[in-house]
Amino acid sequence: MSSARDSQAQHGLKRAASPDGSGSWQAADLGNEERKQKFLRLMGAGKKEHTGRLVIGDHRSTSHFRTGEEDKKMNEELESQYQQSMDSTMSGRNRRHCGLGFSEFQEVEEEAAGHSSDHESSEDSESGSDSEQDESAEELQAAEKHDEAAVPENKKEAKSNYKMMFVKASGS
C-alpha cells in the first residue's frame, strides 16, 4: 500500500473535469475572432460558412461546354478507335495475347482447308468431261486420306513443341 501512495505522491492527483466547460474549444482565447475561427476550422470543430464563392461547374464562363459539332466529332473519333481495335482483335494481328490454349497449327489447318476447296472448285471449272471430274475427285479423296493420316503425327509434334516452348518460357 505504501508503494501506491508513493506513486500517487510522485505523479500528483488527477484533476476532475471542470464543471464550467472550460475544456471546450469554443472557449479558447486565441486573440481575435478570425484566428479563433481558423483554429476551430483546422481542428474540425468549426462550422463551415458560405464564403460567397461559386461552386465548381456553376458558372457558365468557367465551364467548358461542347457544341453539337464537337460532340459528333468526338463520337466519330471514339467509334473509329473502337472499330480499329475490334478489327485488330478479329484479324489476329496481335498474336502476343492468344492465351494458353492457342495453337498456330489450327490456323494452318484452316488455311489449308480453305486452299483445297479453292483448288477443288478451280479444277471442277477447268475439267469438261465427267471422267476427268471423277478422276480428280478420287485424287482429292486419296490426298485427304493421306492428310488425315499425317495430321495426328503433326498434332503430336505441335503439342510436344508447344509444351517445350511453354516449359522453356516458364523456366526462365
From Swiss-Prot:
Origin: domain of life: Eukaryota
This protein's name: Small acidic protein
Pfam families (UniProt xref): SMAP
Skewed-composition ranges (Basic and acidic residues): 46-76, 112-122, 142-160
Family annotation (PANTHER family): SMALL ACIDIC PROTEIN, SMALL ACIDIC PROTEIN-RELATED
Region of interest called Disordered, as start-end residue ranges on this chain: 1-172
Biased composition (Polar residues): 1-10, 80-92
Expression by tissue: Expressed in otocyst.
Family: Belongs to the SMAP family.
InterPro entries tied to this protein: SMAP, SMAP_dom
Annotated Acidic residues bias: 123-138
